[in-house]
């Protein structure tokens, strides 16, 4: 069964829609250049109602320093920390040990060689994530709506289930899963009515589409 992560949540109604729709993961962004950026205290308030829920909370970061990791663990207490920058295997190991949380390592993909880079992290992290490489000059490493050739993931096997991300929405997620074979999917801009503005109806539609895969 394919599982979904709804990323970039910032309002209670969006969180509620994600959980009610059956999302396995909910993500909160901590990156100042993103329209979805939150402070850890605000995220902690949003996830307070989820402690009795099986949904896993994810703190999405870009090259986080130790101070941010410590602040996240003191406030939001995420189940997983997603790193979406230039983190090395050594740094990823440090983040995992310092936080005690699982780590999702994201990769920007435009070719098979980009997928190959994940091998150095396989077995080191809880999940790998393959996202579209942003256009040149973009300040955001993800959440841009860009896609890559989903078939680059077809036949790839990793020690833990991996995520497909980048340009997914309620209308193409079934095709994306079929083309990639990915067991996990991640969506952000594809369920928004504007930059950073999640639409609960689109969240529900996306999760319904995933259930039909």
From Swiss-Prot:
Catalyzed reactions: N-(5-phospho-beta-D-ribosyl)anthranilate = 1-(2-carboxyphenylamino)-1-deoxy-D-ribulose 5-phosphate
Enzyme Commission number(s) from the entry: 5.3.1.24
Any one GO MF annotation of this record: phosphoribosylanthranilate isomerase activity
CDD domains: PRAI
Keywords of this entry: Amino-acid biosynthesis, Aromatic amino acid biosynthesis, Isomerase, Tryptophan biosynthesis
Pfam families xref list: PRAI
Pathway: Amino-acid biosynthesis; L-tryptophan biosynthesis; L-tryptophan from chorismate: step 3/5
Major enzyme class: isomerase
Family: Belongs to the TrpF family.
Protein name, per record: N-(5'-phosphoribosyl)anthranilate isomerase
Species for this entry: Caulobacter sp. (strain K31)
Lineage, top ranks: Bacteria, Pseudomonadati, Pseudomonadota, Alphaproteobacteria, Caulobacterales
Gene name in the database record: trpF
């Amino acid at each position: 069964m394919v599982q979904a992560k709804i990323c970039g949540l910032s309002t209670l109604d969006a969180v509620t829609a994600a959980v009610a729709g059956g999302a396995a993961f909910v993500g909160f962004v901590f990156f100042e250049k993103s329209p979805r950026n939150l402070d850890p205290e605000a995220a902690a308030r949003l996830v307070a109602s989820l402690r009795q829920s099986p949904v896993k909370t994810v703190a999405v970061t870009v090259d986080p320093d130790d101070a941010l990791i410590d602040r996240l663990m003191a406030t939001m207490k995420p189940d997983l920390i997603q790193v979406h920058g230039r983190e090395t295997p050594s740094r990823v190991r440090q983040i995992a040990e310092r936080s005690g949380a699982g780590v999702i390592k994201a990769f920007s993909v435009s070719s098979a060689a980009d997928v190959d880079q994940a091998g150095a992290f396989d077995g080191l992290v809880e999940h790998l994530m393959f996202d579209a490489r942003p256009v040149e000059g973009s300040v955001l490493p993800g959440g841009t709506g860009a896609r890559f050739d989903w078939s680059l993931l077809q036949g790839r096997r990793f020690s833990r289930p991996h995520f497909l991300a980048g340009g997914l929405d309620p209308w193409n997620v079934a095709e994306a899963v079929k083309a990639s074979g990915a067991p996990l999917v991640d969506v952000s801009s594809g369920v928004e009515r504007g930059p950073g503005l999640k639409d609960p109806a689109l969240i529900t539609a996306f999760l319904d589409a995933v259930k039909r895969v």
